């Protein structure tokens, strides 16, 4: 064994061994308990970043630990390879998205291997290959036949920069989630999948997910947004149709003083024929944002349509307004307004001088003061005829029942969730497998024409999708009739909604899934990824699983038992102000810093002498140029050091602050482990451990070893507090470094301890542990070694520490045998100088003894 720890030598050797032995390839084995550990697959952007490294290190630690428990562990990896960035990069680099993507995959695959992740590479998949997306296309055609897919023209969120549609979830504060451009509203024909048909199940089954973070479940609950209410029909004078509205507050119905319809509503369109002001308003609304966050904050505007609706219970005529806060896509495109008890309705009514009628009493029973704002709390009705005096629940039921009896109301459950618009106007995605025949019939692409292959040898102009620009590509023949293919492609969330299931049978040629393999491995035991996916990917992921279950492919209700959302990786961020006042962000690697005595940064400059402004720690990002290249760190310290720092610096679900001093500390620790094993093995062979012949000191050290095994096992397995597991191993290492190594049993005990330490560290730092296991002559490869088991007998304490008090004040701490009697403890306490001093010449009036813990002598 060489004396120095040289990760650059050992890591490549160990990785080659894993490749040659195919160590992490697995097949179904009914004789073993399975464990499916999955990290969210990466987008092949070109280089791994520290967020990837953290995510995949957590997954690898869990997978290696479960493997050492003797389970059949599947840990696959693949590439979420479709998506917009490839188009931009292709234009910029004068290439096509496909070669750019495949080059990136090859590069990033090497980076993953360099970090020592134990993946089953035989299952690797890339979602941009026809072998993958053909089954997604086939499944879509089956959903269409089941009535779960439809096409309609709808107002969508349109990103003018990316030239594509965004789902509501992809609009953050009125801007595109990807490029931060202001989102516009546009009418466009789109394909939808009926996720709303599964809304109740998606909501109710959240209760089955005991091991998902409450925050994620809460976000999904709110996004699905189930509400119970009443649908009410209004007659409208001089208009051929009725208006239908939905309300969750029928108790306030007697205070309804106007209705509001969307600008795109047929009633508004009809009224606009003779109303130029309304026509102009409708035009203006075409550019209104359709994201909810934007709707909530924008100025509320409207125009009176001139139509009057009739209140079903009072018979009063109330005006119908067109308003920019009502959307055709939500509900019926019409809402009832109760300005006395809804703040938005109140602001609109105040602005346009509409009637405000209070119908709910204030909490103290008085009439509400509506001079400044609406009263939105629930309460007792007044000003409501026969319903006066009823509380919220009684009024809800009484008014709902009356409207139902009159034939103008119906109790309904509504959802905030909308159907999933899966059409994208981009090129680099899976073609949607639908065709339009010459006679106008729309139908799924026949099975014998699947997959509809996306051409990869294309020229990108940065504006139009190559398959839209090429009229020949769309031409096909179906049932002997000329037809045109759909030129939209799938939202890339389609591919990431079912990849986890395809990993169970990536080579299967007969269909989307081999049910036998899928049902052996699924559900995923632990799924690891960022919380930013809570209401997009993680909702579609659950939805697709239920679709596949109902198609008979899988037999479980949910795709993953446990979800672990890792925290972000933060780093120092610095900038200097340029000549034009712009901020120029400088990498923390290039910042020369001065720190105060507490280690805080007080001054910074770069190599060019610019005074730098330090903005603190923030998420690693390109925009702030504060990303740290994992490859540079691996080349400098080794993969094991980077992995160890990632797992030690912070709990897995909390933010991690990147500190190179911490990386150096992790590296020093591994050098100490190496040194201890080197010094131990240099002394030659080791005798067998004889636990009955150990001295008290040796027993105490062995107790520490086995207590550490118990703690680390609990920390990794049950608690998943990986940082505290590492801290416990470090603490044990400090004790081992000071332990005597001269005697035969000293060395035998050290051998047992080091074999345990190396196995406990193996999930975190597998390369060094693989090597040290061989040097310690451990049995076989460490990859097949069992996890160490704590010896219960070794952990039993022979002695215990008792606190001795006189009149409640601590005077001594004594070590006594665990089976010592009260008399023996009192006798031993009396031998302590300080205790004897306070007992001299006084009478002990009372003795309080808590066995093995406390002796309090009350004297007077």
UniProtKB/Swiss-Prot annotation:
Q: Which InterPro entries match?
A: aa-tRNA-synth_I_CS, aa-tRNA-synth_Ia, Leu-tRNA-ligase, Leu_tRNA-synth_edit, M/V/L/I-tRNA-synth_anticd-bd, Methionyl/Leucyl_tRNA_Synth, Rossmann-like_a/b/a_fold, tRNAsynth_Ia_anticodon-bd
Which keywords describe this protein according to UniProt? Aminoacyl-tRNA synthetase, ATP-binding, Cytoplasm, Ligase, Nucleotide-binding, Protein biosynthesis
Top-level taxon of origin:
Bacteria
Q: What is its EC number?
A: 6.1.1.4
- Which reaction equation describes what this protein catalyses? tRNA(Leu) + L-leucine + ATP = L-leucyl-tRNA(Leu) + AMP + diphosphate
- Motif: 'KMSKS' region; annotated at 619-623
Q: A biological process (GO) annotation for this entry? A: leucyl-tRNA aminoacylation
Q: Where is this motif: 'HIGH' region?
A: 42-52
The record's subcellular locations are: Cytoplasm
Which residues take part in binding ATP? 622
> What's a single GO CC term here?
cytosol
GO molecular function terms attached to this record: aminoacyl-tRNA deacylase activity; ATP binding; leucine-tRNA ligase activity
Family label: Belongs to the class-I aminoacyl-tRNA synthetase family.
Give the protein name, as stated in the record: Leucine--tRNA ligase
Biological source species: Shigella boydii serotype 4 (strain Sb227)
Q: What is the lineage of its organism?
A: Bacteria, Pseudomonadati, Pseudomonadota, Gammaproteobacteria, Enterobacterales
């Amino acid at each position: 064994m060489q004396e120095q720890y040289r990760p650059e030598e050992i890591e490549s050797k160990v990785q080659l061994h894993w490749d040659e032995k195919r160590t992490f390839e697995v097949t179904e084995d009914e004789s073993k308990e399975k464990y499916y550990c999955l990290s969210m697959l990466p987008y092949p952007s070109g280089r791994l970043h520290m967020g990837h490294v953290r995510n995949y290190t957590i997954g690898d630690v869990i997978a290696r630990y479960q493997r050492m428990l003797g389970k059949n562990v599947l840990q696959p990896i693949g590439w979420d390879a479709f998506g917009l960035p490839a188009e931009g990069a292709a234009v910029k680099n004068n290439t096509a998205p496909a070669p750019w993507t495949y080059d990136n995959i090859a590069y990033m695959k090497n980076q993953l291997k360099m970090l020592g992740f134990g993946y089953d590479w035989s299952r690797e998949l890339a979602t941009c290959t026809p072998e993958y997306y053909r089954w997604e296309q086939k499944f879509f055609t089956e959903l269409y036949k089941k009535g779960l897919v439809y096409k309609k023209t709808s107002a969508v969120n349109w990103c003018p920069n990316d030239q594509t549609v965004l789902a509501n979830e992809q609009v953050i504060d009125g801007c595109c989630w990807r490029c931060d451009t202001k989102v516009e509203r546009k009418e466009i024909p789109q394909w939808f999948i009926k996720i709303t048909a599964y809304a109740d199940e998606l909501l109710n089954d959240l209760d089955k997910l005991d091991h998902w973070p409450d925050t994620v479940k809460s976000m999904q609950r709110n996004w699905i947004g189930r509400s119970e209410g009443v649908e009410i029909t209004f007659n409208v004078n001089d208009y051929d149709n009725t208006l239908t509205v939905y309300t969750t507050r029928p108790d306030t119905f007697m205070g309804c003083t106007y209705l509001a319809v969307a600008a795109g509503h047929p009633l508004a369109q009809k009224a606009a024929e003779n109303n130029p002001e309304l026509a102009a308003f409708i035009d203006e609304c075409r550019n209104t944002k359709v994201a909810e966050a934007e709707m909530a904050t924008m100025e509320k505007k409207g125009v009176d349509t001139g139509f009057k609706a009739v209140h079903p219970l009072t018979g009063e005529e109330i005006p119908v307004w067109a308003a920019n806060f009502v959307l055709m896509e939500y509900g019926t495109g019409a809402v009832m307004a109760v300005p006395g008890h809804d703040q938005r309705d109140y602001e609109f009514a105040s602005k346009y001088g509409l009637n405000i009628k209070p119908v709910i009493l204030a909490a103290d029973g008085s009439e509400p003061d509506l001079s400044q704002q609406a009263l939105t709390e629930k309460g007792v009705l007044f000003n409501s005829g026969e319903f006066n005096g009823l509380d919220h629940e009684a009024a809800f039921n009484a008014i709902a029942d009356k409207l139902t009896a009159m034939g103008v109301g119906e109790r309904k459950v509504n959802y905030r969730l909308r159907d999933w618009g899966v059409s994208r106007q981009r090129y680099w995605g899976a073609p949607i497998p639908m065709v339009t025949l010459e006679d106008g019939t729309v139908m799924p692409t026949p099975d014998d024409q699947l997959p509809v292959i996306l051409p990869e040898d294309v020229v990108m102009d940065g504006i139009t999708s190559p398959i839209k620009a090429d009229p020949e590509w769309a031409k096909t023949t179906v049932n002997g009739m000329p037809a045109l293919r759909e030129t939209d492609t799938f939202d890339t969330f389609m591919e990431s909604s079912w990849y986890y299931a395809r990993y169970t049978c990536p080579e299967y040629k007969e269909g989307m899934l081999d049910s036998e393999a899928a049902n052996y491995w699924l559900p995923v035991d632990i799924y690891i990824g960022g919380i930013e996916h809570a209401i997009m990917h993680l909702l579609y992921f659950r939805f697709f699983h239920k679709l596949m279950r109902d198609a008979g492919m899988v037999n479980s209700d949910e795709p993953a038992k446990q979800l672990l959302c890792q925290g972000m990786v933060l780093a120092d961020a610095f900038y200097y102000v340029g000549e034009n006042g712009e901020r120029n962000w400088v990498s923390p690697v290039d910042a020369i810093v001065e720190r105060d005595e507490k280690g805080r940064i007080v001054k910074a400059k770069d190599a060019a002498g610019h005074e730098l402004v330090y903005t603190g720690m923030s998420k690693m990002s390109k925009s702030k140029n504060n990303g740290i290249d994992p490859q540079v760190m691996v080349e400098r310290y080794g993969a094991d050091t980077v992995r160890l720092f990632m797992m030690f610096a912070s709990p897995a679900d909390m933010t991690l602050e990147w500190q190179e001093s911490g990386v150096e500390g992790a590296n020093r620790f591994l050098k100490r482990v190496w040194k201890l094993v080197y010094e131990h093995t240099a002394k030659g062979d080791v005798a067998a451990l004889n636990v009955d012949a150990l001295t008290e000191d040796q027993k105490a050290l062995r107790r520490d070893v086995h207590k550490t095994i118990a703690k680390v096992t609990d920390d990794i397995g049950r608690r998943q507090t990986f940082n505290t597991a590492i801290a416990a191993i470090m603490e044990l290492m400090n004790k081992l470094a000071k332990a005597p190594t001269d005697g035969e049993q000293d060395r035998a005990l050290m051998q047992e301890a080091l074999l345990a330490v190396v196995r406990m560290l193996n999930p975190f730092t597998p390369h060094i542990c693989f090597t040290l296991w061989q040097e310690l002559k451990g049995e076989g490869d460490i990859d097949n070694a069992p996890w160490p088991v704590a010896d219960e007998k070794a952990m039993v304490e022979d002695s215990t520490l008792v606190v001795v008090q006189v009149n409640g004040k601590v005077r001594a701490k004594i070590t006594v045998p665990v089976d010592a009697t009260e008399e023996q403890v009192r006798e031993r306490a009396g031998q302590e100088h300080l205790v004897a001093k306070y007992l001299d010449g006084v009478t002990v009036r009372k003795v309080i003894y808590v066995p093995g813990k406390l002796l309090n002598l009350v004297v007077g």
